[in-house]
């Protein structure tokens, strides 16, 4: 299972760039395997992302903004959901992954 982070490499919004960076840094720091999917370069992936976000999770207006997070083809959530799971220490549950036991640094 690979976490897919749908992002926009050419976004002019600083907030979106910071949120994307925060998600990727968290995944790297926790050694969670992930794949970046750039929706600005691949129209078919943008359409796939829109189609696979559950209707009840779509914004009231407009299109869903990146980053959007999937575990393979299963939708996990957007940045706000990711942030909430980070704050409540439930990120592995949010990402639909088994929690890893804490490892002691040598």
UniProtKB/Swiss-Prot annotation:
Q: Which UniProt keywords apply?
A: Nucleus, SH3-binding
Q: Which family does it belong to?
A: Belongs to the SH3BGR family.
Q: Record the organism.
A: Xenopus laevis
Highest rank taxon of the organism: Eukaryota
The UniProt record lists the keyword Phosphoprotein: no
Entry protein name: SH3 domain-binding glutamic acid-rich-like protein 2-A
- Record SUPFAM superfamilies: Thioredoxin-like (SSF52833)
List the molecular function annotations (GO) for this entry: SH3 domain binding
Map motif SH3-binding onto the chain: 61-67
List, alphabetically, the GO terms of the cellular component aspect: cytoplasm; nucleus
Main localisation:
nucleus
Intracellular or extracellular location(s): Nucleus
Q: Which Gene3D superfamilies match?
A: Glutaredoxin
Q: Which InterPro entries match?
A: Glut_rich_SH3-bd, SH3BGR, Thioredoxin-like_sf
Q: Which Pfam families match?
A: SH3BGR
């Amino acid at each position: 299972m690979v976490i897919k982070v749908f992002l926009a490499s050419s976004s002019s919004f600083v907030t979106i760039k910071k949120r994307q960076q925060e998600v990727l840094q968290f995944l790297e720091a926790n050694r969670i395997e992930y794949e970046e999917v750039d929706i600005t370069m691949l129209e078919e992936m943008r359409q796939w992302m829109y189609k696979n976000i559950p209707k009840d999770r779509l914004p009231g207006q407009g299109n869903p903004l990146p980053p959007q997070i999937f575990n393979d083809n299963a939708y996990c959530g957007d940045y706000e959901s990711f942030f909430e799971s980070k704050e409540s220490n439930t990120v592995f549950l949010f990402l639909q992954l088994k929690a890893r036991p804490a490892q002691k640094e040598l």
